[in-house]
């Protein structure tokens, strides 16, 4: 741990003071693509786990600096309690955020994906099952603290954010916190350094998501072609090629880089609803398992149904908005993807009813 943290600090010092790398976005995509491809096929304990562990020090360091900035500067929050349901972050955009329901429940979507993350990575890093309790609950509390810090950062520079001067979420967060810290005497001269470190910390979070998501996408691509209980080692012919871990990783990474280079933001609006569909799937899996082992699963049925309803309503709104206000090819692509997700939601609802309410022989 000491050596790892020391190397991180040394690398940051070198990058900030002597040898910063200025590469194009496409070049960084290729570099990151190579990294996540390697991370996807190597055992968790070799690369993913130690990298996650060392990145956590950046997280805690960032949060400590942010808390010092908030309590030390006593910032005035100039954001109004309510603005409107229209996005004012980009001048003249006129993009509607939609109604409070279901937008609120598909915006706060970060928890849904972790049911999948736990299946392929978290479960391999637990010493015993009970360790999941403090990890899950502690992670939720830390995430809540980070959410409050983010609101404070946005509120502190709201007057600059509204006109469109600072538009990217990462820049908004880093600017707000670094300017708070600049108000504190012993941090007054370190605003640019703190800004860079905050950007680095956020980038490290994104990297943890990328390599884990690539591993999970590779799992799902392989399982798509396999029968229940079958592994890629049992497959033959073209199925053996499609389910090979290296081939599946290449397909996953290439598609990701292609989306990144061609305009992933065009379909990003569907992320929230599609992610909540995964939440419903996770709840269904746990409810089915509890029912199979003879334990009470009723506490999971309502949230599963709620997530399905929220997902379908949000997707229908998205489809309607893109069809009635189609401006380019991407509008129709979003409408088609949204329609497919609605179909998947209905299939999931049918499977859920059959699984949870079927009569025992």
Listing of model-derived features with the role each one plays in the protein:
Residues 1, 19-29, 46-55, 161-168, ...:
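Transmembrane helix-loop boundary segments of multi-pass membrane transporters
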Residues 25-42, 68-75, 86-129, 133-138, ...:
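Hydrophobic, membrane-embedded alpha-helices of multi-pass small-molecule transporters
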Residues 36, 59, 206-218, 252-256, ...:
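Hydrophobic alpha-helical segments of multi-pass membrane transport proteins
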Residues 42-56, 113-146, 165, 216-217, ...:
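Hydrophobic, small-residue-rich membrane helices and short re-entrant helix-turn-helix hairpins
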Residues 70-86, 138-177, 212:
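Extracellular/periplasmic helix-exit of transmembrane alpha-helices
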Residues 92-106, 148, 156-160, 185-205, ...:
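Select transmembrane alpha-helical segments in multipass membrane proteins
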Residues 138-145, 190-194, 223-261:
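Loop-to-transmembrane helix boundary motifs in multi-pass membrane proteins
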């Amino acid at each position: 741990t000491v050596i790892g943290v020391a190397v991180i600090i040394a690398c940051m010092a070198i990058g900030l003071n002597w040898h910063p790398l200025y590469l194009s976005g496409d070049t960084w995509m290729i570099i990151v693509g190579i990294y996540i491809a390697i991370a996807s096929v190597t055992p968790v304990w070799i690369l993913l786990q130690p990298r996650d562990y060392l990145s956590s020090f950046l997280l805690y360091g960032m949060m400590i600096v942010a808390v010092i900035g908030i309590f030390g500067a006593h910032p005035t929050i100039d954001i109004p309690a309510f603005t409107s349901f229209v996005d004012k972050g980009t001048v003249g955009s006129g993009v509607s955020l939609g109604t409070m329901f279901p937008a609120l429940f598909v915006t706060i979507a970060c928890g849904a994906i972790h049911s999948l993350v736990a299946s392929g990575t978290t479960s391999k890093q637990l010493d015993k099952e009970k360790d999941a309790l403090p990890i899950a609950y502690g992670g939720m509390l830390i995430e809540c603290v980070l959410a409050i810090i983010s609101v404070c950062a946005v509120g502190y520079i709201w007057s600059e954010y509204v006109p469109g001067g600072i538009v990217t979420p990462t820049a908004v967060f880093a600017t707000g916190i670094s300017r708070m810290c600049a108000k504190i005497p012993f941090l007054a001269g370190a605003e640019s350094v703190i800004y860079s470190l905050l950007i680095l910390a956020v980038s490290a979070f994104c990297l943890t998501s990328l390599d884990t998501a690539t591993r999970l996408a590779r799992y799902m691509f392989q399982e798509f072609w396999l029968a229940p209980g079958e592994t890629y080692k049992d497959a033959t012919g073209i199925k053996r090629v499609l389910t090979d871990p290296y081939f599946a990783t290449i397909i996953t990474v290439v598609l990701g880089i292609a989306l990144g280079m061609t305009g992933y933001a065009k379909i990003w609006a569907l992320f929230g609803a599609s992610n909540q569909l995964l939440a419903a799937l996770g709840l269904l899996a746990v409810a089915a398992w509890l029912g199979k082992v003879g334990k009470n699963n009723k506490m999971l049925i309502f949230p599963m149904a709620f997530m399905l309803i929220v997902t379908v309503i949000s997707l229908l709104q998205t489809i309607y908005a893109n069809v009635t206000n189609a401006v380019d090819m991407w509008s129709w692509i979003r409408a088609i993807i949204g329609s497919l997700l609605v179909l998947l939601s209905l299939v999931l609802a049918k499977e859920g009813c059959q699984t949870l309410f079927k009569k025992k022989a």
